């Protein structure tokens, strides 16, 4: 570590040079780094939950004997449109001084913590239960209203993912 006003030999020997000669820059950089790491974790929670629910609903929908509850086009729309905007929203959460109160993590720690895993599985199972309940309800409908019911299923799936995004943002 060297200061910006230090000698050129010190600057060349150091890994980091503080151009403004302020040690507060180190604390600010740590805060931004921890906040970025937390935002990445938030996106992982969002992404794994949405994919767990989507894949499980297609699999269980096939087991229940319905048409594909989510078509390839709908899955593509979810992955391209919803995930892109969710990534921007979750990545733009500003840093908070609260991250400085957390203990430093080990470099060997896995990015998915046990509480994140519980959140992913818990929310995923809850969403899946709602969607499977709707599929069972759809199976009792006349076949002429099935396209409308599949549209309602997709709308319910998208609305649950909006809730998932807000859930991930407060994680």
Task: Give the ranges of each region predicted by the language model.
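Membrane-embedded transport module
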Residues: 4-171
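Active-site-proximal beta-strands of protease catalytic cores
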Residues: 1
């Amino acid at each position: 570590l060297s200061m910006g006003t230090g000698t050129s030999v010190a600057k060349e020997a150091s890994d980091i040079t503080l151009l403004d000669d302020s040690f507060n820059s180190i604390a600010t950089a740590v805060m931004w780094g921890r906040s970025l790491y937390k935002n990445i974790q938030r996106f992982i929670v969002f992404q794994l939950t949405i994919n767990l629910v989507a894949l499980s609903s297609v699999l269980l929908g096939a087991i229940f004997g319905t048409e594909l509850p989510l078509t390839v086009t709908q899955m593509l729309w979810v992955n391209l449109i919803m995930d892109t905007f969710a990534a921007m929203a979750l990545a733009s959460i500003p840093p908070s001084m609260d991250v400085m109160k957390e203990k430093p993590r080990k470099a060997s720690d896995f990015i998915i913590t046990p509480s994140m895993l519980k959140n992913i599985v818990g929310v995923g199972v809850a969403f899946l239960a709602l969607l499977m309940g709707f599929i069972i309800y759809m199976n009792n409908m006349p076949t002429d209203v099935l396209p409308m019911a599949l549209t309602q299923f997709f709308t319910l799936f998208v609305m649950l993912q909006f809730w998932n995004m807000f859930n991930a943002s407060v994680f």
